[in-house]
Each structure stands twice: as structure tokens, then as C-alpha cells.
């Protein structure tokens, strides 16, 4: 392999750490933000250079289309468990990862990308309980009726998704809780993933 420049080595290390911590590569925008580039295009140029040197493969058509070559593949650390999520930061940002669990992502359909510890009892009627580890498949869109991990403004919540026009209703599965109503014309909402399974608290240490 041809030698890397210091900047290329820094980017390659960032990619490896992101995959080890979150199970997926960073986006171009995330690379640019973390390393202080002015735009995602600057990150793209460095990625092309790494691809030419045989460190990575670039897969077109996806923001996370970066694959390490076999000799660069990091050790599998398992699924990351996400803790408290800081305002404005990606849910899979490295600083949010509390630890990793040796759970096979293919146990779930679709496969899980990360785990989220359940807080509260708002989803207890469908068996999602306080302290459970919720297996989550990373997506950015959802269909009505799906159980989602959603970010409303700066809060992350697990609820059943329903969209009517420009209004989203995030329904609890506990009659003691009212729906969270989000007016998309004035509030920000993003889907962080779909719930694909539960690991009961105490079943996996």
C-alpha cells in the first residue's frame, strides 16, 4: 500500500473508529465537521485519494458508502449502546456510545444498527419496558404504525409513528400518556431508526 499523508491517515483512523463505535462509516458531512473542513466536498477528495491507495472502497449513491478493504477491517466490537444524546449531535456520534454488546445484528429483521436503553414506561403495553435494550435499525423515514426512535427538537423518544399532512403524532403505548404532536411547519423532527427488537433488562450482561 502506498504511504498515506498525515491528513489521509487521520481520516482513515476516523473511519475505523466510527465503524468500531457505531457499526457504520461516517458521512462526508460528519468527516468534514469533525476534521474542520469547510465542506463535504473536501472530505470527498480525501476519500478518493484513500480509495486510490487501496485503503477503502467508495460505493456510490449513499451518504455512508465507504467500505474498508479487508486488510483495514477493524475488530467487530458488537452493537453500540447509545446513552444520553447531546442536543444537535448525531445519535451515533462517538461520544454517545456507552459500551458495546456482542449481539448478532442479524438476529433482528431488518438487522439492528445500534441499541438504545429504554427510559420510562410509555411503551409498556407492547412489551417495551423501562431498562430494556431496544434494537434499532437506522433509517431516516417511517411509515404510519411503525415504532420509531424520533428526535423532536432536541429530545429523543420511542413512539408509534403517525403522519397526517404536515402534522406528526407520536403515540405512546400506555393510556396514561397523550400523543406528542409535532407541527412540521414550525418544529423539527427527524427519524433516527425503527425498533426491530428488545433485549430484556438482565437478559444480556
UniProtKB/Swiss-Prot annotation:
Its EC number is 3.4.21.88. It is an enzyme of class 3 (hydrolase). The keyword Ligase does not apply. It catalyses: Hydrolysis of Ala-|-Gly bond in repressor LexA. Residues 28-48 bind DNA. The keyword DNA-binding applies. Keywords: Autocatalytic cleavage, DNA damage, DNA repair, DNA replication, DNA-binding, Hydrolase, Repressor, SOS response, Transcription, Transcription regulation. One of its GO terms (molecular function) is DNA binding. CDD domains: S24_LexA-like. Pfam families: LexA_DNA_bind, Peptidase_S24. GO terms for biological process: DNA repair; DNA replication; negative regulation of DNA-templated transcription; proteolysis; SOS response. The active site is at 122 (for autocatalytic cleavage activity), 159 (for autocatalytic cleavage activity). The record marks 87-88 as: Cleavage. NCBIfam families: lexA (TIGR00498). Homodimer. Represses a number of genes involved in the response to DNA damage (SOS response), including recA and lexA. In the presence of single-stranded DNA, RecA interacts with LexA causing an autocatalytic cleavage which disrupts the DNA-binding part of LexA, leading to derepression of the SOS regulon and eventually DNA repair. Belongs to the peptidase S24 family. PANTHER family: LEXA REPRESSOR, LEXA REPRESSOR-RELATED. This is LexA repressor. The gene is lexA.
Amino acid at each position: 500500500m502506498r504511504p498515506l499523508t498525515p491528513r489521509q491517515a487521520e481520516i482513515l483512523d476516523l473511519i475505523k473508529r466510527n465503524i468500531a463505535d457505531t457499526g457504520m462509516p461516517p458521512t462526508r458531512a460528519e468527516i468534514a465537521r469533525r476534521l474542520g473542513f469547510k465542506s463535504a466536498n473536501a472530505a470527498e477528495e480525501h476519500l478518493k485519494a484513500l480509495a486510490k491507495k487501496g485503503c477503502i472502497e467508495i460505493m456510490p449513491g449513499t451518504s455512508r458508502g465507504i467500505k474498508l478493504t479487508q486488510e483495514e477491517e477493524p475488530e467487530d466490537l458488537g452493537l453500540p449502546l447509545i446513552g444520553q444524546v447531546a442536543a444537535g449531535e448525531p445519535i451515533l456520534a462517538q461520544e454517545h456510545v456507552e459500551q458495546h454488546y456482542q449481539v448478532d445484528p442479524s438476529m433482528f429483521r431488518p438487522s439492528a444498527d445500534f441499541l438504545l436503553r429504554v427510559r420510562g414506561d410509555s411503551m409498556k403495553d407492547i412489551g417495551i419496558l423501562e431498562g430494556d435494550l431496544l434494537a434499532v435499525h437506522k433509517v431516516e423515514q417511517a411509515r404510519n404504525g411503525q415504532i420509531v426512535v424520533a428526535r423532536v427538537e432536541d429530545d429523543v423518544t420511542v413512539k408509534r409513528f403517525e403522519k397526517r399532512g404536515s402534522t406528526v403524532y407520536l403515540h405512546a403505548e400506555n393510556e396514561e400518556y397523550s400523543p406528542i404532536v409535532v407541527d412540521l411547519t414550525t418544529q423539527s423532527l427527524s427519524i433516527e431508526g425503527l425498533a426491530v427488537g428488545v433485549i430484556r433488562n438482565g437478559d444480556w450482561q
